[in-house]
UniProtKB/Swiss-Prot annotation:
Organism encoding this protein: Sorghum bicolor (Sorghum)
Record's protein name: Chalcone synthase 6
Function: The primary product of this enzyme is 4,2',4',6'-tetrahydroxychalcone (also termed naringenin-chalcone or chalcone) which can under specific conditions spontaneously isomerize into naringenin.
Reaction catalysed by this enzyme: (E)-4-coumaroyl-CoA + 3 malonyl-CoA + 3 H(+) = 2',4,4',6'-tetrahydroxychalcone + 3 CO2 + 4 CoA
EC number(s) on file: 2.3.1.74
PROSITE patterns: CHALCONE_SYNTH
Active-site residues, as the UniProt record annotates them: C168
Pathway in which this enzyme or protein is active: Secondary metabolite biosynthesis; flavonoid biosynthesis
One GO BP annotation of this record: flavonoid biosynthetic process
UniProtKB keywords: Acyltransferase, Flavonoid biosynthesis, Transferase
SUPFAM superfamilies: Thiolase-like
Alphabetical list of PANTHER family matching this protein: CHALCONE SYNTHASE, HYDROXYMETHYLGLUTARYL-COA SYNTHASE
A single MF term (Gene Ontology): naringenin-chalcone synthase activity
Similarity comment: family membership: Belongs to the thiolase-like superfamily. Chalcone/stilbene synthases family.
């Protein structure tokens, strides 16, 4: 009986890609229903039958005015909410009604974003080897990953990973996971989808739970998809950003800063500490750990993609690091036009950045800069840090990092 003719090391080497994971395409989608922030306080207090809470409504108006959000998109229409009054109450059993929405609409919205990414990628969907699906909106078995696989007609053998209940940092998490998959599986093409719908968190106002109202003033619906792969075939694939490194950390003394709990009443949202202060206090350490090995200490010399959890977070990070206002332009644009879409936000920002960079005649997809950072902030308090390298817009070729 003949022995093996190859070693484990040879097999291992053959299994792995040569170059870094690269974002090859981006697609985004929102529900059709658009809500303008200036009109939202009146609408919100009317649909939840809370107009008698005049002082609370004034507080909510101030929250909306300070949010720096111009508009958001929401699957929940006035008609649907009128038919489901328990979803409009502050704490009424309503999980079944919420689940009925999200188990259908989360994969459907994800499909719309994925189809755009696949079209831009230009390769047959049969070449997708892995699917990473992320949502904080509901839980089901088989999951939204399974539903999307069926909807898109992906191969039954596609390797799926479903990530539920991660929260706002997860846009960084999915890129970190996709990087590992792409670099450790030669020829892999990873479809990453983040799809978020506020149907799980929508509820009426309460004097005793002002942090829930913060969420009502910020959250919007959206889905984003990216294709990630290493060693791109540049005859047909157009690299956008390289994923150079990725890490996750829990901030010290931050337990309970951001919590979400799935209950009969839906997903309840809690802000228990000074979240902007906690993030800005620790941001320099995350930047140093990520960029010191690269010899980068000037954080105005890199492009920025930061989860827009709210304007105060962005303001305090800018102040702490001494950032010029234009570094957060793409981030603030997405906050203004879509609100906080949880995990999908940073992928929307990448899309906005590469498009605006091309429109403005910049040399690279990263606003003319070579190196960049992507931050995700969320429950824990958890921070995801991804170091990115842009690609020249003129040639579309990758740069050796």
């Amino acid at each position: 009986m003949a022995g093996a003719t190859v070693t484990v090391e040879e097999v291992r080497k053959a299994q792995r890609a040569t170059g870094p994971a690269t974002v090859l395409a981006i697609g985004t989608a929102t529900p059709a229903n658009c809500v303008h922030q200036a009109d939202y306080p009146d609408y919100y207090f009317r649909i939840t039958k809370s107009e008698h809470m005049t002082e609370l409504k004034e507080k909510f108006k101030r929250m909306c005015d300070k949010s720096q959000i111009r508009k958001r998109y929401m699957h929940l229409t006035e008609e649907y909410l009128a038919e489901n009054p328990n979803m409009c109450a502050y704490m009424a059993p309503s999980l079944d009604a919420r689940q009925d929405i999200v188990v259908v609409e989360v994969p459907k919205l994800g499909k719309a974003a994925a189809q755009k990414a696949i079209k831009e990628w230009g390769q047959p969907k049969s070449k997708i080897t892995h699917l990473v699906f992320c949502t904080t909106s509901g839980v089901d078995m088989p999951g939204a990953d399974y539903q999307l696989t069926k909807m898109l007609g992906l191969r039954p053998s596609v390797n799926r990973l479903m990530m539920y209940q991660q929260g706002c940092f997860a846009g960084g998490t999915v890129l970190r996971v996709a990087k590992d998959l792409a670099e450790n599986n030669r020829g892999a093409r990873v479809l990453v989808v983040c799809s978020e719908i506020t149907a799980v968190t929508f509820r009426g106002p309460s004097e005793s739970h002002l942090d829930s109202m913060v969420g009502q003033a910020l959250f919007g619906d959206g889905a984003a998809a990216v294709i990630v792969g290493a060693d791109p075939d540049e005859r047909v694939e157009r690299p956008l950003f390289q994923l150079v490194s990725a890490s996750q950390t829990i901030l010290p003394d931050s337990e309970g800063a951001i919590d979400g709990h799935l209950r009969e009443v839906g997903l309840t949202f809690h802000l228990l500490k000074d979240v902007p202060g906690l993030i800005s206090k620790n941001i320099e350490r995350s930047l140093e750990e990520a960029f010191k090995p690269l010899g980068i200490t000037d954080y105005n010399s890199i492009f920025w993609v930061a989860h827009p959890g709210g304007p105060a977070i962005l303001d305090q990070v800018e102040a702490k690091v001494g950032l010029k206002k234009e570094r957060m332009r793409a981030t603030r644009h997405v906050l203004s036009e879509y609100g906080n879409m949880s995990s999908a936000c940073v992928l929307f920002i990448l899309d906005e950045m590469r498009k605006r960079s091309a429109e403005d005649g910049q040399a690279t997809t990263g606003e003319g800069f070579d190196w960049g950072v992507l931050f995700g902030f969320g429950p824990g308090l958890t921070v995801e840090t991804v170091v990115l390298h842009s690609v020249p817009i003129t040639t579309g070729a990758t740069i050796t990092a």
